[in-house]
Each structure stands twice: as structure tokens, then as C-alpha cells.
Amino acid sequence: MRDDEATGPLTPGLGRMGSKDPAGISRYNSAIVAIGDELVGGFTLDSNSHWLAERLRLLGYPVKRITAIRDRPEEIVEQLRRELSDPEVTHVFVSGGLGPTPDDRTFASVAQALGREQVIWEETRARIERRVRRMHEAGLLESPDVTEGNLRMARIPAEPAHVFKNRRGMAPGVMYEADGKSIFVLPGVPLEMKGIFTEELEPQFLSGGSAATVRELRFTFAVEARFYPLMRELEEKYPDVSVGSYPNFETKELVIRCLGKDPKRVDEVIEVIRRRSAELGMTGEAR
């Protein structure tokens, strides 16, 4: 879910003002590519991207861009090449399209984008065979034989930097290095994606980030436009702190959110906003 979905629409012409995009605060920046017709068709909520964006922000790998695209190879390849060509993006997270059916085309598309062949990853195939056999013994499958659909999940782009175990499903998570970037290809099933991320990916490959400090002030029945002069002033005086305004027209709240690497600078900005808004007769609640 994007911030404007969580807190309501933005004021036309004012929108989300900031001294710097939060992605610009970190030396690492991420991009998320969510793949699936069910996402862009409005059938399934893209909870994976929302969860990933929050985790990455907390770990110091803030997200520059989230893109949802269809299960179309040419569109997947095009988007991946866009992320690889972006000099600001250091980490790319791809989710979805790793299943056993013909419309699961992510591995093949990643291989094309990276200019690599697809290979059967033997460790993954062996794990799939064991899982299918156990499911047959439990009466969940009629046959203990691995199908072509099962094998699709073991056919990955060649030369992975790391292959993650999926303890909750069959499709593996895979990491690649290309053009100085790290690309993580993860299952679209939320339970599987989160398991791989928290148990292996995060502790092994995301320990070098520096998380931003986040502070908020919440105002009730405040008019967003009244903050415009102050936020423009802060933009000039505190270029290292991102300041954004987020109105929620359902709760009648206006959230002023500040992000920065230096906690003292962020607190200083919050105090300026608190003091100046009080002079205008508005009191913000700290969060």
C-alpha cells in the first residue's frame, strides 16, 4: 500500500512536499517489481510490496520505486532493464510469477534480462522431489512423481549468487549480481516471501544499511496549505531531512513526517514545526 492510500489523497498542487526524497537519504536504494495479472487487475492486494517497503526502510535500504506489472515476458524484461540502468538503485526485489503454471514466467524473463541461460538447479529439484513425495504419502497428491510444472520452479537463470531455501513452498528465492546491483527474485506467496526474507535474505545480505530516523506530528482539522511556507523554508535550511505532509480526509488528520539519517537534525526539524504551528494556533501530537 502506498502512503497516499494509507493516509488519504493529496491536496492538488501541494501534494507531498519534501526537502529530499527519503530514498536520497541512504547510500542504498531499492526498487520493487511486483509481478502478476492478479495485482494489476485489482483482484489481489499487493501486500508484498507494502511489507517489503517497510522492512527495507527500517533496514536502511529505502525504496525509490514500486512497480506492478503483468505476467508478460516483454514487460518484465523491460522493467528489469530499467531498474538495472538506474544509477540510484542498488537493490532490486522481484516478487511473483515463480509457480508451476504456464503464466509463471518470471525466471525465464529474468534470464533474458540478464542475458543468461536457464538451468535446472539440482539442489532445488531434489528438495522439490522430497516435498512431492511427502505430500503423496500424506494423501495430498495422487502421484509421487515430479511433474513438468514442478520442474519449472527448479529451472532458474544460470550463475546465481545465492539460492535461498523455501521452507514453506517449492519455488526458491534466488539472488543475482549484475551491473553492480543485487537482484533478489522471490516467490509471490506472502508467507513464502516473508520467510525467505526474514530467515535468510535479511541477515545475510542486508546488514550494511543505515536506517533513517522517523518522527511524526499529527494535527487534527489542520489545513495542509498553511504549512506550505514553512515546508519550503525547511527545504532550504534542512536539505538532509525529508519532510512530507500526508492528509487523511476520513480521520481529519494531517500527518507531518520527517525522515533523516541524523536523529538530532530530525528532532530539530520537528521542534521547528511544533513551534511554528503553535504560533498559528495548531498543536501537533508526536508519534
Feature annotation, model-predicted:
Residues 2-32:
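N-terminal amphipathic/basic leader segments beginning at the initiator methionine
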Residues 35-37, 94-102, 187-188, 259-261:
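Glycine-rich beta-strand-to-loop/alpha-helix junction loops that act as flexible
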Residues 74-75, 88, 105-207:
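Proline/glycine-rich low-complexity loops and linkers
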Residues 81-94:
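Short, structured active-site "lid" loops
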Residues 178-276:
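An accessory alpha-helical subdomain
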Residues 276-287:
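Conserved short beta-strand edge segments in small beta-sheet-based binding/regulatory domains
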